[in-house]
């Protein structure tokens, strides 16, 4: 029996099934079409194999599916479980579509395609077991970073192309390639997912007629309904490349009709700062005539890929701030790191990629950009507070949860010696930093040797504990004092972290400014994150203006992330509402201060 036949009795959810690190591109937190008829079981049992999966933490949801981390009860291997209630899947065409999605996806196995492990059903639910992509998708990366550096774009695009080459060799057209369907694992490898709109080409020259895709990435031949084939994926990759380098999609407008009109007219412009070689490849892929576009198998031979530096790996830190390409690729390894290698002189200079290459965008957040993030956050908090989220007849706080917005970095511990030296802190990745009273900053990475030094004017330098100038000896000694104090008094001793390939490109966000009130300490990181630790009950807020989200850590140390706009819609408990009101006042204080480069005076 073939896969489609096996899956035939399964009801099918729409193509926009869940998100949050699993295939599917529905917006997490979107309203569910109808209440779940049954509660999702704690243990999922495959009736055929009797294999059991234990349901873990919530990952996200879409219109018809909820997604959870699940683990094999025997092997303890962890997967993403996409769970679709049958009560919402009653129409015959939904059954057909799910059968097709499962049939296509389970036939695929490639390094850059989300792994398909299992599917089964019980009387109430359909369960799909997929590879877990812990680092979410390129959509979250885009929201945090906007435009990427050119080496990063090459790194991601090369993997997208390799995955798509595999699909096309197997006669599969994805038809919905976009940032939200390009997932990232712990090693920041791209995994193509969500095959809800995918189709199989049955014979050479077949042209599909179905109108499908996502507005910003949809090819003109799909809109014209004249028939389409593999070329639509190349068009989508062109849109993705533009978005990664420019920071927004090429045809995006606030009006769907206008977006479609621009696509049909091929009306877009490439900013002047984009490398001409990159601009040329974008133009080749975004040609109205599908036959004029390069095939997926020709793309990697383009000069953009053959002449430019492609990192072998990228550090996790680049999910939130640009990596450093401060030395030539031939010496990009930890052993060749020069002491006090200057990355960036001044806050507005662009990060160099490699000698003779111009690189955009600006590497470090300018003061204007940081103030813009704070302004956005103030507006977001003003809006949610004005809605009086705790004063509802029915508060559905759980509907606002969106784990895809979980912060990459936050302050896990801190110690205040500002009367003499400064504020010491530890980030969640076990790196340790000090914001000194002279407004300089020193960060020790979690490998215990690599150091990042930021001067008052924003110049970033890189050195090591074993190789540094004498002028920094005192600060390194103080940093070690802070580190030892936090290890002994505040932290559990952690195992040494083995350096991974790509870590030599890491740059960490640093503590930009902080202040204390009677109630809390307020910490503002250089990546835009604002953290508030409340003294009395040890609750915490971690606010991200780029994701428009808040993470709330309650007295029990439960860690939940919500989209602010959804809290506005669904409401929240009084405890969270009062802290959001307080947060708005603190962000206003951060924004109005003129001395935001170091410690603010507490009121």
Swiss-Prot record:
Start and end residues of each stretch annotated as Activation loop? 194-221
Query: How this protein is processed and modified after translation, per its record?
Result: Catalytic activity is enhanced by phosphorylation of Thr-210. Phosphorylation at Thr-210 is first detected on centrosomes in the G2 phase of the cell cycle, peaks in prometaphase and gradually disappears from centrosomes during anaphase. Dephosphorylation at Thr-210 at centrosomes is probably mediated by protein phosphatase 1C (PP1C), via interaction with PPP1R12A/MYPT1. Autophosphorylation and phosphorylation of Ser-137 may not be significant for the activation of PLK1 during mitosis, but may enhance catalytic activity during recovery after DNA damage checkpoint. Ubiquitinated by the anaphase promoting complex/cyclosome (APC/C) in anaphase and following DNA damage, leading to its degradation by the proteasome. Ubiquitination is mediated via its interaction with FZR1/CDH1. Ubiquitination and subsequent degradation prevents entry into mitosis and is essential to maintain an efficient G2 DNA damage checkpoint.
Keyword tags: ATP-binding, Cell cycle, Cell division, Centromere, Chromosome, Cytoplasm, Cytoskeleton, Isopeptide bond, Kinase, Kinetochore, Mitosis, Nucleotide-binding, Nucleus, Phosphoprotein, Repeat, Serine/threonine-protein kinase, Transferase, Ubl conjugation
* Region of interest (Important for interaction with phosphorylated proteins), residue spans: 538-540
Q: Where is this motif: D-box that targets the protein for proteasomal degradation in anaphase?
A: 337-340
Gene3D superfamilies documented for this protein: Phosphorylase Kinase, domain 1 (3.30.200.20), POLO box domain (3.30.1120.30), Transferase(Phosphotransferase) domain 1 (1.10.510.10)
Entry annotated with the keyword Transmembrane: no
Give residues annotated as binding ATP: 59-67, 82, 131, 178-181, 194
Spell out the activity regulation: Activated by phosphorylation of Thr-210 by AURKA; phosphorylation by AURKA is enhanced by BORA. Once activated, activity is stimulated by binding target proteins. Binding of target proteins has no effect on the non-activated kinase. Several inhibitors targeting PLKs are currently in development and are under investigation in a growing number of clinical trials, such as BI 2536, an ATP-competitive PLK1 inhibitor or BI 6727, a dihydropteridinone that specifically inhibits the catalytic activity of PLK1.
Ranges of residues in domain Protein kinase: 53-305
Q: Which GO terms describe its molecular function?
A: anaphase-promoting complex binding; ATP binding; identical protein binding; magnesium ion binding; microtubule binding; protein kinase activity; protein kinase binding; protein serine kinase activity
A GO cellular component annotation here is: spindle midzone
Q: What happens when the gene is disrupted?
A: Lethality: homozygous embryos do not develop beyond the eight cell stage. Heterozygous mice are healthy and fertile but frequently develop tumors, most frequently lung-invading and liver-invading lymphomas. Analysis of chromosome spreads of spleen-derived cells from 6-month-old mice show aneuploidy.
Glycyl lysine isopeptide (Lys-Gly) (interchain with G-Cter in ubiquitin) crosslink: positions? 19, 492
Provide the family line: Belongs to the protein kinase superfamily. Ser/Thr protein kinase family. CDC5/Polo subfamily.
Q: What is this protein called?
A: Serine/threonine-protein kinase PLK1
The scientific name of the source species is Mus musculus (Mouse)
Q: What is the lineage of its organism?
A: Eukaryota, Metazoa, Chordata, Craniata, Vertebrata
């Amino acid at each position: 029996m073939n896969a489609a036949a096996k899956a035939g009795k399964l009801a099918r959810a729409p193509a926009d099934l869940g998100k949050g690190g699993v295939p599917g591109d529905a917006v997490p937190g979107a309203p569910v079409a109808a209440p779940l008829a049954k509660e999702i079981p704690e243990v999922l049992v495959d009736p055929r194999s009797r294999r059991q999966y234990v349901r873990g933490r919530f990952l996200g949801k879409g219109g018809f599916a909820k997604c959870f981390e699940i683990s094999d009860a025997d092997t303890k291997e962890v997967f993403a479980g996409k769970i679709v209630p049958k009560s919402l899947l009653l129409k015959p065409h939904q059954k057909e579509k799910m059968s097709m999605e499962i049939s296509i996806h389970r036939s695929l196995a490639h390094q850059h395609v989300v792994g398909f492990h299992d599917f089964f059903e019980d009387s109430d639910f359909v369960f799909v077991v997929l590879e877990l992509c812990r680092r979410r998708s390129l959509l979250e990366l885009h929201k945090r970073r906007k435009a990427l550096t050119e080496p990063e774009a090459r790194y991601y695009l090369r993997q997208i192309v390799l995955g798509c080459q595999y699909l096309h060799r197997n006669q599969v057209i994805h038809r919905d390639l976009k940032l939200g369907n390009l997932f990232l694992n712990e090693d920041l490898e791209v995994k193509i997912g969500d095959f809800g709109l995918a189709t199989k080409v049955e014979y050479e020259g077949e042209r599909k007629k179905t109108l499908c895709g996502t507005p910003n990435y949809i090819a003109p031949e799909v809109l014209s309904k004249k028939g389409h084939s593999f070329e639509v994926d190349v068009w989508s990759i062109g849109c993705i490349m533009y978005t990664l380098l420019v920071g927004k999609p090429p045809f995006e407008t606030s009006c769907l009709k206008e977006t479609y009109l621009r696509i049909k007219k091929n009306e877009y412009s490439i900013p002047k700062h984009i490398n001409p070689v990159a601009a040329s490849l974008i133009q080749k892929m975004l040609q109205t005539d599908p036959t004029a576009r390069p095939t997926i198998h020709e793309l990697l031979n383009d000069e953009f890929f053959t002449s430019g530096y492609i990192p072998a790996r990228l550090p996790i830190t680049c999910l939130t701030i640009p990596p450093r390409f401060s030395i030539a690729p031939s010496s990009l390894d930890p052993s060749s790191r020069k002491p006090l290698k200057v990355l960036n002189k001044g806050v507005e200079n662009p990060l160099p990629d490699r000698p003779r290459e111009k690189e955009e965008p600006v590497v470090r957040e300018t003061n204007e950009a940081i103030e813009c993030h704070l302004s956005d956050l103030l507006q977001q908090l003003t809006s949610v507070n004005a809605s009086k989220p705790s004063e509802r007849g029915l508060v559905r706080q759980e509907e606002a949860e969106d784990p895809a917005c979980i912060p990459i970095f936050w302050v896990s511990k801190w110690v205040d010696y500002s009367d003499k030296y400064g504020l010491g802190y530890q980030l969640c990745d076990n790196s340790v930093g000090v914001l000194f009273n002279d407004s300089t900053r020193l960060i020790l990475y979690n490998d215990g040797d690599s150091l990042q030094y930021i001067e008052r004017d924003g110049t970033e330098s890189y050195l090591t504990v074993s190789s540094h100038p004498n002028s920094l000896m005192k600060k390194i000694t103080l940093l070690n004092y802070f580190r030892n104090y936090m290890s002994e008094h505040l932290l559990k001793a952690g195992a040494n972290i083995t350096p991974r390939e790509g870590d030599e490109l890491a740059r960490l966000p640093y503590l930009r400014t902080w202040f204390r009130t009677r109630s809390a300490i307020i910490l503002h990181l250089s990546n835009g994150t604002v953290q508030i630790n409340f003294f009395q009950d040890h609750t915490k807020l971690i606010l991200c203006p780029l994701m428009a989200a808040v993470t709330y850590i309650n007295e029990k140390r439960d860690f939940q992330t919500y989209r602010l706009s959804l809290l506005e819609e669904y409401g929240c408990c009084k405890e969270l509402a009062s802290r959001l009101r307080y947060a708005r006042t603190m962000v206003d204080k951060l924004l109005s201060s003129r001395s935001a480069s170091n410690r603010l005076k507490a009121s």
